[in-house]
Structures are given as structure tokens and as C-alpha cells.
Amino acid sequence: MKPGSPPHGAVMLAGLALMAVLASVIFALSRSAVVSADKARSMALADASAKSVATWYAQVLNYDAYTNRAIAANEIMMAQAVTMVAWTQYVEELAQNIGTVAALIPALQPVATWVQQVSTVTHQLATTGALLEVPLRSAYTRALQSSQSIMHTSANAFAAQALVNEVVWTGDPRFFGQLIASTSPSSFFNFTRNFTGEERADFASLIRNSQDSYSRQRGFTQRLYLMPTVSCIPRNLDQAFARLNRRGGTWLTADLQDWESADTLSIHTWRRRSRWNPTCGGTGESIPLGWGAADASVSGSDGMNEDPAGLRVNPSAFARARDQAVSIPGYLGLSSHRELTDITQQARRDALIRVPVLVRLDMGKIAKIKAGSKVFDAKASGSETSRAAPLGDALWSLGVAETYFLRPPDTLGGRSEREFANLFAPFWESRLVLANSADRAVAIALAQARGNK
């Protein structure tokens, strides 16, 4: 063949063959790229939808923790209100009794009168505030508990599936996602429940322990050095003087239906052992100086039902406090609350919720590439360990997430021990995890069942 002459014969055939090979390679690469992109998108959508549901569950559980804390805080605030009413009544009675004594000293009368007026106004303000505050706060605790039930009712299996659909279809409307039954669809619903009746005992203990020390129990016993013992022969220094006994406290009753508070102050003097033994034996209440009591109860009845603060040390003052107790209506009792269904230590250690999601893309929806008049369907070759693989007439991906409890180390206050799952600390989180054998078995069964149709 002369230089510059057009190609012909075997050279032309070789060129056409080379062009065909190049076209086939380009097509194969394009086909592989399309399927690889859909495979990656399928895995991403499975992970995103599973993580979204697990995060939603974590948010609901954290809401339970915050509302449980809010219920406890409102109970403590009601206890403080009842404490203020009892204490201001106690101060008012004490001021009046001191004023009676001060009336014998003209120079002290103006001061005593001013103290009486201030104490009376303070008690009236405290009572008015408590009458408004206790019903509102008690109703608010009921609203918080109701909101917990509403949140858990809304977080059902149908809503979780709707969230999966929203995440998947927002990412790519060609895909379809579903929660699979390797984990019970009602696992989140059964994970927690309302604690009522006697089940609230631990919650009540938490509230009692959260009271400040003064509200919980306030009292002292002091010697009155200005009041020496004259009715018997002292045998030691302590018996040489009278005693000033102060007792008071605020408590939630055992039936969890009342907040009670009382304060008493009395002078105790030493008594002789017997008519024939003039030495000092024991003390007895001689002069009640101050008393006050308040009761916020479901029944609205006056009086003290219990005495965990030792108020009966001053029997006369305590009797007057009970007779004059201020009744604060509107308290609805300790609210029920949400807690883990199984509160054993082992269950709380292993508490978590698994969310497995299977995402499907029908092969008919995978992009198709035409070469001349022939249509080539994109097919992927996935290994058994791949989370996205073709089976039957669809591409399948499995994503699994967990809702779990983990308190950050910097919030443990230097403690080395681990805090187990509970609904009082808002540290519920979500994470992606590997599928287990049950997840894979259910996913394969669903894929095969669809392929056999």
C-alpha cells in the first residue's frame, strides 16, 4: 500500500474490531459505575433511616428523663412552699409569745410589736403564695406525666415505618425501606411503662433525698444557761440547766398523698427521779414557745398523720401545731412517672433498642444503558459479606442502629463506676451497629420471598 492511500482490507477490519472492544469496555465501566452508585446509595439510605428512628427513640427517652426531673423538682418546690407556711406560722407564734413577755419591759414593747407585725404579714404572704402555687404545680406534674404518655403513644411502629419511608424517599424515591421483624416491632413500646401506686416508692425516695437538709429535718437541743435547774439535784453539768428543744421537718407521707410540715420549740426542765429521790432523772416539756404546721393533702384534711421529725418531743407544742395546721388544698398526690419496664441491675446494664431497616431497589428501576438496539440491564455482583447485594429482581441493603444509654465521662463527677440505664439522666444516644445473624436471616427470607413471587 502506497503512503497516503486510504485504508482497506485487513487494516480496516482491525480498526473496527479495536473500536468495538473500546466501546464494550466503556459500556462495562458505565454499567458498573451506575450499579455501584445505586449500591452505595442503598447502603447510605438503610443506615440513615435506621439511625433516624434510633435517634427519635433516644430523644423520646431523653424527654422522659427531663420530665421525670421536672416532676421531682416541682414536688420539691411544693415541699418548700409547705415548709414556708409552717415556719412562718411558727415564727408568728414565737413572736407573739415573746411579745407577751416583752410587754413587762416598756423599752422592748416597740420592737416586740414590730416583730409581731412583720411575722404576721410574712405568714399571710407565705400562705397566700402556697395556696396558689401548690395546685398549679401539682396540676403541672400531671401534665408532664400525660405528655410522656403522648410521646410514647406517638412513637409506635407505624410512625417509625413512616419515618423510614420519609428518609428513604427523600433521598431517592426509587427505593423502598422497611423495618424488619428481627427485633419486635413493639420493642420500644414495651421498653418503658408508667409506674403508679406502690411502684412510685423509689421515685418518692429520690424526692425525699433531694430535699435540702433544713427542709427535711430541722432541730436542735441547747442548754439554757439563764435558766438553772431548781426542781431537782443535778448530777452533772448538763442537768444543771434547762433545755431548749427545737424540732421541725417537712415530709412526704408514706401513702404519697400528703406533704406535711411542722415546727415546734419548747423549754424542757429536769424532773426529780421520785418523791423520795431528789436527784434529776429526766426532762419534761414546761413551756411551749412556738409552733406551726401546714398540710397539702389530696383529701384536704387538717392535721399531721406522721411524725418522722421527732416533733412529739414537744408534745404540747406539737398538739397546738396540729390543731392550728394550715390546710393547703389542690395537691393531687405524687404523680406517676415513666421508667424502664425492667429495672433490675442486669436489665439496666444491657438496656438498648435495636432498629433494623431493609432497603430495596427493584432492578427495573436501576438505570439502563442502551447500546445500539440491545438493552443491557445493570447487574451487580455482591459477596456474601456485603450489606448491599442483588437477590432476585432487586438490590437489597440492610442497616441496623441502636438506641443505648451512656453517660459522658466528664459528667460522672470523678466517679469511676458506670451509670446504668435509667429515665432520670438524659444520656440516651444512637449509633450504627453491625447486623447480627437474626437480622441477616430475616432480610434474606424477605428477599427470597419476594423473588419467588
Name what the model sees in each region.
Residues 1-86:
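Alpha-helical assembly-interface signal, strongest on the long, hydrophobic N-terminal helix that forms
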